[in-house]
């Protein structure tokens, strides 16, 4: 493992060409990490910021979404300077609270705020769901019941190549699926839903 300048990005030698991890530890609390873009699909205003958490997977910092938005609104935060067509994206996430949802997930092949893929876990529903967001309309492609515990760190990983998508949760294969809605390269990042307050750490990505 090799730490690059500012300690923000950790280069990983195995698993994928040019694989990297962002741990948010060199970003000032209250700010967004460099080269990240935050927004929301739907009405409302997301609140993304780096914040300290001593329980972080790689302490001291995490990326947190704490905005309270409408039930059919989806806050996202993407690393805008990457473009992945085939590869993987992974993250550790901790759902903290939410009356309607306690969700955390990853997005990939992100074209804009209305067009991208999502895989997420939800501590209120105890499931993992693969979605596509096309023209601002979310559609569930496949879902699997799995235990997602609130206030606990979990890992989520998606491998994608062509139309094939493979999702793993806490080190276990959750699902495999095929979809051809988005085939072009795009950005990748993290995602929540509605009133979910969720923390993220060790965001990892790589191309193949």
Question: For each predicted feature, which ranges?
Answer:
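Short, solvent-exposed beta-strand-to-loop segments that form ligand-recognition rims
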Residues: 163, 168-189
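Extracellular glycan-recognition surfaces and repeat-rich motifs
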Residues: 31-63, 73
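Short, aromatic/His-centered strand-loop micro-motif at the edge of beta-sheets
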Residues: 134-157
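Short tryptophan-centered beta-strand motifs in secreted/extracellular beta-sheet-rich domains
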Residues: 24, 89-91, 152-167
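Ligand-recognition surfaces built from glycine- and aromatic
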Residues: 20-23, 182-208
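Secretory/extracellular carbohydrate-interaction modules
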Residues: 29, 65-134, 193
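Extracellular carbohydrate-recognition regions
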Residues: 18-42, 201
């Amino acid at each position: 493992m090799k730490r690059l300048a500012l300690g923000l990005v950790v280069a990983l030698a195995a698993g994928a060409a040019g694989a990297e991890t962002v741990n948010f530890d060199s970003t000032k609390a209250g700010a967004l990490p460099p080269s990240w873009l935050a927004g929301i699909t739907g009405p409302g205003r997301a609140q993304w910021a780096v914040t300290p958490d001593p329980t972080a997977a790689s302490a001291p910092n995490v990326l947190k979404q704490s905005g309270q938005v409408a039930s059919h609104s989806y806050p996202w935060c993407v690393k805008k300077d990457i473009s992945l067509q085939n590869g993987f994206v992974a993250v550790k996430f901790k759902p903290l609270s939410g009356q309607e949802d306690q969700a955390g997930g990853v997005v990939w092949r992100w074209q804009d705020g209305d067009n991208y893929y999502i895989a997420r876990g939800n501590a209120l529903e105890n499931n993992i769901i693969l979605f596509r967001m096309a023209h601002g309309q979310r559609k569930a492609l496949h879902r699997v019941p799995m235990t997602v515990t609130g206030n606990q760190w979990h890992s989520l990983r998606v491998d994608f190549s062509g139309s094939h998508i493979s999702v793993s949760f806490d080190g276990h294969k959750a699902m495999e699926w095929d979809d051809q809605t988005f085939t072009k390269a795009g950005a990748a990042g993290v995602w929540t839903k509605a009133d979910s307050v969720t923390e993220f750490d060790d965001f990892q990505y790589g191309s193949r």
